[in-house]
Amino acid sequence: MYPDATIVCGKPEMEDEKFDTLKNPSVLFEVLSPSTEDHYRGKKFFFYRQIPTLKEYVLINTTKYFVEISRRQEDNSWMFEEISNPDSYLNINTIDFRIPLEELYKNVLQ
């Protein structure tokens, strides 16, 4: 399973037998399509939650302003946030980054 984009804090650690398999992602991004969104919310997220270094999992809808962020808490539970207002910001807390949804979706939604 490979995400659409990844952020790694620190030095990337790769699986010995597979150079393209990252062991220590901090943030994973998936760009949703109608045919993949259930898979990304279900089986894929279940698998990703097992990665101890993962702090945030971001799902980006391609048909409307809608981003879902799951964040690992200190007790290892996950907190869920939805953002759908174009004037709102997507915050990636792991790297102290924020972007307005309107900018994220520029040239995607007309």
Give the ranges of each region predicted by the language model.
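C-terminal interaction segment
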Residues: 1-51, 59-110
